[in-house]
Amino acid sequence: MWLGVVTLFPEMFRAVTDFGVTGRAVSKGLLEMQTWNPRDFTHDKHKTVDDRPYGGGPGMLMMVQPLRDAIHAAKAAAGKEAKVIYLSPQGRKLTQQGVEELAKSSSLVLVCGRYEGVDERIIQTEVDEEWSIGDYVLSGGELPAMTLIDSVSRLVPGVLGKKASAEQDSFSDGLLDCPHYTRPESMDGLDVPAVLLSGNHEHIRRWRLQQSLGRTLLRRPELLENLALTGEQEQLLAEFVDSIKQDA
């Protein structure tokens, strides 16, 4: 997958290219990323990229010309099929379903705003989609862009050691992930559930599914409203609810 990022702070993206899962993906050639700084496309000695908004109001806006030219440069490198995404609080909220949709793209150009945002004409003429990572305020689009890159790259074939790693992540099937344990078997009076030590793969599968369903019910019940549960899932969830009532 090819990713282009338009940002005033390209150095921030070393966190993506140099570390962790995404860093390994870059080193293996599974993920390619380039950055474009709008300041490099200015025509004045001060490299001005922002100006006051028409109509007044607080803060500054990113100007059209430097940002537009940076986007054009990124698109030229990406090819005609590239989708231009602006990270914005007004955008579609990023979910695992959205991540899976974006992962089908061979190339993406991510535009990171700063200050009070960008001139609306950039969105009208250059942006294909707007995406948001949540209903809260950040200082710029860089952190949302890195979040999107990390989540999408996990679905690129070969990035994770095992396909099952991505399939078992929270939200991959619409549910939260189940609890996980590693050594030691006992710590401070807390023991690993016996079923995980049993070696019975079917029992382990059902336990994990039940825990995933139960955790979703307790922590994010709204997620269950959008799911059509199978007969097995309904049974496991009912058993989980009964066990909670008995322990109460």
From Swiss-Prot:
Its main location: cytoplasm. The keyword Nucleus does not apply. Homodimer. Gene3D superfamilies: 3.40.1280.10, tRNA(m1g37)methyltransferase, domain 2. It comes from the Bacteria. It is an enzyme of class 2 (transferase). It catalyses: guanosine(37) in tRNA + S-adenosyl-L-methionine = N(1)-methylguanosine(37) in tRNA + S-adenosyl-L-homocysteine + H(+). Transmembrane segments: none annotated. Pfam families: tRNA_m1G_MT. GO terms for biological process: tRNA N1-guanine methylation. Belongs to the RNA methyltransferase TrmD family. This is tRNA (guanine-N(1)-)-methyltransferase. The lineage of its organism: Bacteria, Pseudomonadati, Pseudomonadota, Gammaproteobacteria, Alteromonadales. It is found in: Cytoplasm. The gene is trmD. HAMAP family: TrmD. GO terms for cellular component: cytosol. Specifically methylates guanosine-37 in various tRNAs. Its EC number is 2.1.1.228. S-adenosyl-L-methionine binds at G113, I133, G134, D135, Y136, V137, L138. Keywords: Cytoplasm, Methyltransferase, S-adenosyl-L-methionine, Transferase, tRNA processing. GO terms for molecular function: tRNA (guanine(37)-N1)-methyltransferase activity.
